[in-house]
Amino acid sequence: MPFIVNTDQDREEMLRSIGASSFDDLIADIPPEIRLDRALELFPALSEQEVMTLLEGLSSANSSSAGFVSFLGGGAYDHFIPSAVKSIVSRSEFYTAYTPYQAEVSQGTLQAIYEYQSMMCRLYDMDVANASMYDGATALAEAVLMAMTITGRELVVLAGKLSPYTGSVLKTYLEASGHGVIHQNRLENGIGSVDGLKGLMNDRVAAVVVQQPNFYGSLEEVEAIGAAARENGALFIVSADPVSLGILAAPGSYGADIAVGEGQPLGNHQNFGGPYLGIFTVRQPYVRKIPGRLVGMTKDREGNDGFILTLQTREQHIRREKATSNICTNQALCALQAAVYLSLLGKQGIREVAEQCTLKAHYLAGRITELPGYSLKYSAPFFREFVLETPLPAAVIISAMLEKGIFAGYDLSASGENGLLVAVTEKRTRAELDSFVQALAAL
């Protein structure tokens, strides 16, 4: 629909209706010396076709996984997303919905969120899940703040190798809150040292945090880490990859008090870094301390099932100064995508995705380490990604592979380390894996 400007008569009628004689009356309070007295220096008007051509030209400078074979990981993964996911979430009643404060007119949205919460509880083996957080990093940061509130303590121990980006967000949250100190456990073979962790524990530790699998893709000794936390009265927080839970033990099964995760692999595209989905689950005793929105199921006066936002006194729109967090509009659409994705795959489907990731990652690691100069940096078990020691700097390899249409991985020098972090999802075919190996061999 074209934009039709107001006529002089339209403007006169509007001014007259508010008691003004001219537009200058509306800006009389702005000192003349700071007013712009010339026309704005804007681009000349373009047609729709010209705008599309301009934007396509600008976007062509980007390289995306849509046109490359991607082995990039480190927190965002190139998984296959069934076309039905987009078809369902694009329905207008989902796509344009806002926060469902009025339950009587939002039953569809509320039920969808309730189903998402139920799926997260089953996947993570926890009692309660909220409606979502902004992303996995903010979910973990909120979990740490929650642990400090519950325990009254101020220290947090990072038991293993946490994503440096998540760690940066956590540091920002703690600095903004005015309290909290982070202690990093020492690493051995790319995972946290259990003995080192025990040496860091004391009665001031509010929470022990572990990422499973960790940033290197390696599997941490989560049961021993959880036991060390419980022995000292600290809460045990696990940031678990949701896809890995298709084959790995769920956080609830080994005693997590709070389990969070990055939900991007569940039906959400990489989206150049966002929007993403923060998964947040807790045990029942902590339900009134959980941040974010909660959808509950109830009965109406006629005995029919209904869905509502429950325990709202925790939230900032009720009692801002006493809210458990100030998250407002959450990632409900991303959460819906995760719920639709899991519904389409089912229990067996998510298990198959996890198995394919593991098998293909181990196949690729085996093939690459047959090449001269390439070796695994760590020998700990891994799930979907692994760190390579390479004969050439990782940046050189990544640049060379780009010319062959391959994202070779993540250069760990970006976080002050050495090595190439390579991720493999179920999307990668045997031919793509072998082609990557051949391309590396040709360097």
From Swiss-Prot:
Enzyme Commission numbers on file: 1.4.4.2
A Pfam family: GDC-P
Gene3D superfamilies: Aspartate Aminotransferase, domain 1, Type I PLP-dependent aspartate aminotransferase-like (Major domain)
GO BP terms, alphabetized: glycine decarboxylation via glycine cleavage system; nucleoside metabolic process
Keywords: Oxidoreductase
Annotated InterPro entries: GcvPA, GDC-P_N, GDC_P, PyrdxlP-dep_Trfase, PyrdxlP-dep_Trfase_major, PyrdxlP-dep_Trfase_small
Entry keyword Methyltransferase: no
EC category: oxidoreductase
GO MF assignments: glycine dehydrogenase (decarboxylating) activity
Catalysed reactions listed for this entry: N(6)-[(R)-lipoyl]-L-lysyl-[glycine-cleavage complex H protein] + glycine + H(+) = N(6)-[(R)-S(8)-aminomethyldihydrolipoyl]-L-lysyl-[glycine-cleavage complex H protein] + CO2
PANTHER family membership: GLYCINE CLEAVAGE SYSTEM P-PROTEIN (PTHR42806), GLYCINE DEHYDROGENASE (DECARBOXYLATING) (PTHR42806:SF1)
Subunit structure, interactors included: The glycine cleavage system is composed of four proteins: P, T, L and H. In this organism, the P 'protein' is a heterodimer of two subunits.
NCBIfam families named among the record's database cross-references: PRK00451.1
Similarity-based family: Belongs to the GcvP family. N-terminal subunit subfamily.
Function recorded in the entry: The glycine cleavage system catalyzes the degradation of glycine. The P protein binds the alpha-amino group of glycine through its pyridoxal phosphate cofactor; CO(2) is released and the remaining methylamine moiety is then transferred to the lipoamide cofactor of the H protein.
Name of this chain's protein: Probable glycine dehydrogenase (decarboxylating) subunit 1
Record gene name: gcvPA
